[in-house]
Amino acid sequence: MYSLIYITTSGEEESKKIAKILLEERTVACANIIPSMKSFYWWEGKIEEDAESILILKTRSDKLDTLIRRVKDIHSYDIPCILEVSIQNGSEDYLKWLEDSLQG
């Protein structure tokens, strides 16, 4: 099974850094970056507002534990948002490419 991983970062440069490391290590097959968004969230008892970047990764579900550990090592946040969305179905050609890309 395959997964989309949703991560928020402090900005585009951090998203690029994480994406490149995970691609080089073949933990992910593909990374998409949405360079800028606004986030509102609770932190230490008050509502915060920050500019962030979105990093979307595509990988096999069995790589998730490794991916989470690695992102936590690299990420600048104390508690990074790392969420998995299972891919239930998709283009067979794309999923084959994804699998082949993870093999190296």
Task: Please annotate each region the language model reported.
Residues 1-104:
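Positively charged, small/polar-rich N-terminal and surface patches that mediate targeting and assembly
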